[in-house]
């Protein structure tokens, strides 16, 4: 009798779990919960390296496999920028990319993070195309899930760049939401990317939509796989617009998790 009851209970539990998943209509496709100590998993991330300014006159040297700049500890990824007089421009940091290891066309992308603070910091959670099918930036598109510049504390930006809409022309499409405790608490930053539009969220609050006009790739190049990027820049055209405070370093961006779903969980 006990065995029958347990079997029945198991069936009911399985049915309830299946119903919940079906009701939510969302499937987890990929994630990093950062439960591997040390250097971030090379099965999910690669490092981009260099100090050439990255098209924005940034100051940092991005390093690879250096615990000072990127490490996983106690379930959290830390991306940390340091003042370093041995570097030509005076700073080191890290830039992690999932290129070649994880890319998706459409889905719900959510990152739970705590941001650095101070003049000169420029953290970003963003996406670029796996292949530049329509040409180099900005022709093939860019999705900025989260950007924050330290001289404007608490104002978090979600932005889309294309050939027709980009900051070089002053036509980029985006919006901002104030997050007063951005540096002291974790928040979720997300984009729900569908065939017809993108919707941007912070802590589940919707604050920006970008719609597919149906014209051509110059306005919507987002019909191809994109990969994820996590980085902390120093200075640059935007991040360093008000200068760089030399007294604040090191500064860090902490990431609790990165999750990719086929659709937004309800």
What are the functions of these language-model segments?
Residues 1-23:
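Bacterial Sec-dependent N-terminal signal peptides
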Residues 20-266:
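GH16 jelly-roll
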